[in-house]
């Protein structure tokens, strides 16, 4: 997460549009993650009304968390987010349909 603090702010006119995706090991309420969101990024699943869809489960499935994210520049429109099981992985893949500005 420290590396993410070095990201330039998003959503500014004239700046490139950025989409960041991956295993952040952070829920939407994680402090460092919130700082990234405050720099002009939005969680695609949250924008699509699916912000609490679990992407990771503990062995046995007792704990289910949303820790894999697609972050979009706030200028982007998110049309749909889907989460799919990945055979052999304890994480689920996150797919987002995004419209660039």
Briefly describe each language-model feature range:
Residues 13-19, 25-82, 86-87:
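Active site of divalent-metal-dependent phosphoester/diester hydrolases
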Residues 91:
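Short, conserved phosphate/pyrophosphate- and ester-handling motifs at nucleotide-, phospho-/glycolipid
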Residues 87, 99-101:
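A short C-terminal boundary segment appended to hydrolase-like catalytic domains
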Residues 1-21:
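His/acidic metal-ligating clusters that form di-metal
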Residues 70-72, 95-99:
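Short, well-ordered beta-strand micro-motif
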Residues 9, 76, 101:
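Residue-level marker of positions within ordered structural domains that often coincide
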